Regions:
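Short coil-to-beta microelement around the adenine-binding A-loop and adjacent beta1/P-loop entry
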Residues: 18-19, 74
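Conserved ABC transporter NBD signature motif
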Residues: 60-71, 75-76
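Conserved ABC ATPase "signature" region
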Residues: 100, 104, 111-129
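Helix-to-loop junction immediately C-terminal to a conserved catalytic motif
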Residues: 52
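Conserved beta-strand
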Residues: 8-11, 19-29, 60
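Walker A (P-loop) phosphate-binding loop of ABC-type ATPase nucleotide-binding domains
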Residues: 39-43
Length: 132
């Protein structure tokens, strides 16, 4: 039996004091048509952003074709595409981590991205803001 296309278990995410997701469980089988519907603020975008790796989950697990979406980020990005309405990131990410994430979208390893990111911080005079 093949792994589900998407498997979400106990997914939890908070933004400060706001609980966006609490214990979400969901299985989407391979080949299944699926719609994620709900009112504004229900957590649809947060769920999608976590599955696609744009936002880190607080608790729980998210898998795409049996691969953890955090540990196997590149695999996930190769299997799922998303066309966002607006640029969306976890605003609690340090700037440096966000830049490494963005570099990954262009196929750069952390080792390849490091000198480019270091150069950006130096040229922009933001070296002290890496962890902001």
């Amino acid at each position: 039996m093949s792994a589900p296309a998407i498997q979400i278990t106990g997914l939890t995410k908070s933004f400060g004091d706001v609980h966006a997701l609490r214990g979400v469980d969901m299985t989407i089988k391979q080949g299944e048509f699926f719609g994620l519907l709900g009112p504004n603020g229900a957590g649809k975008t947060t769920t999608i952003n976590i599955v696609t790796g744009l936002v880190f989950r607080d608790e729980g697990s998210t898998e795409v074709f049996g691969k953890d979406t955090v540990k196997d980020f590149r695999f996930t990005r190769s299997k799922i595409g998303i066309a966002a309405q607006e640029f969306s990131v976890d605003w609690f990410f340090p700037i440096e981590k966000l830049l490494y994430f963005q570099a990954g979208y262009y196929g750069l390893t952390q080792e390849q991205a490091k000198p480019k990111i270091d150069d950006l911080f130096e040229r922009l005079g933001l070296d002290k803001k890496r962890e902001s």
